[in-house]
Amino acid sequence: MQRAAFKVALSAIAVAAAFASTAHAAGFMLTEQSAGALGRAYAGAGVDGTDLSGVYYNPATMVLHKGTAIQMGFVGIGLNLDYVGEDGTTANGRNKSQAIPHGYIVHQINDKVWFGLGMTVPFGMGTEYDDDWAGDEHGISATILTFDLNPNFAFKLSEKFSVGVGASIQYASADLKIRKNITEQVQTAVNGIQPGAGDAITDASVRSEIDADSIAWGWNVGMMWSPLENLRLGVSYRSKITHDAEGDLSIDELSVTPGSIGPLDLTQIIGTNLTENGLYGDMTGAATVTAPAWAMASVAWDVNDLVSLYGTFRWTDWSSFDELKIDGDGKNVSTIPNKWRDTYLGSLGMDLRLTDWWTLRGGIAYESSPIANPQYRTAIIPDADRWWFAFGSSFKWSDNFQTDVSFAHLHGVHERNIYNDKGAKEGRFRKLDAYLLGVQMVYKF
């Protein structure tokens, strides 16, 4: 009962916060946990000290903040997934624009210990096509949502060195809709009723939809070293979190070509074979979704009172997301192979402090795609290598109050084709772009 109530509470918080349903970072990872750091393409994230997002990126950097402070903000996202098939048909997997919320609290307990709490949406995605679009066997729609509650402690070991550690309680929900080819199974079912009749069937498919959720745990750790007063180096790590999600699975809308098979109708086919073998009907669904581990190294150099330079390198363990397996009533219904590889992000950025209250920033980043073999690219996660181009600004209205606004354009490059299960090219994404707008406020008590 307590677990169910907690799931409802976390779900309500995430929905009320206008959860993200857009995939744009590599895989379905959401880098966007700070609207301020977005303005420099997340270069220096965690060690920059300009906001409280170090709670997420590197908890050791909480020692940069005195007293108590809070931060709230969001990053709004719009997609352009422009697809054209080999036959000239077009589609666009853009979902309605959504917002990724984030919130942080940092409190200095004493001269050596800090406490921080992060509320983030670290993984999420959402793509949606028409039910009858040409690539429906690659996916019709998909939404993955995570909400992460992350308490942390930081310890200042010396004037130059600090460490941080935290735990994550993470709620995840997944809704996946896909049309699955079951031609061989239907041929077998029909031949079992009327021998030889199934040989005339050239195509058969059903629509599968699973809606499942889960709660799981993880941990994170970080370190920061300041060899010089104006130079900070940080490394951090977040563990993978495996969600064994359970919920409802519905398989319906059987489509058979040709539609007429002698004296047989679809009702006979469904009732005789498909339902008994877990290929049709409503059942208990289960899916395993892995939020991968990642490690990050960042540097911040305050060159002078006017300029600060930043850099970040991040590795993400996407090779752990080898396949997406969906079960119904304990039987495997579908397995979607991913064969993903680890990804890397490198970014460089700069802050320019024009006045005591106005700072401009900009950054550029390159991020690799987890898709090792383009034949495993799906329309629901149509990933590709991408460039980030970002700029932003901070406004310090008083010693206690600051606002940040940032914009970024993510542009997908290189191979963007879609293939069928026989290895033939079905089409390509002419554009894989995302547009991000972030706004946040920081208040110090």
Labelled PLM ranges:
Residues 24-41, 45, 87-90, 97-445:
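Outer-membrane beta-barrel porins/channels
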Residues 1-24:
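Gram-negative bacterial Sec-dependent N-terminal signal peptides
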Residues 72-99:
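Mid-chain, structured segments of secreted extracytoplasmic proteins
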Residues 16-21, 60, 74, 362, ...:
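Residue-level signal for alpha-helical transmembrane segments in multi-pass membrane proteins
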Residues 29-44, 63-80:
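Transmembrane beta-strand segments of Gram-negative outer membrane beta-barrel proteins
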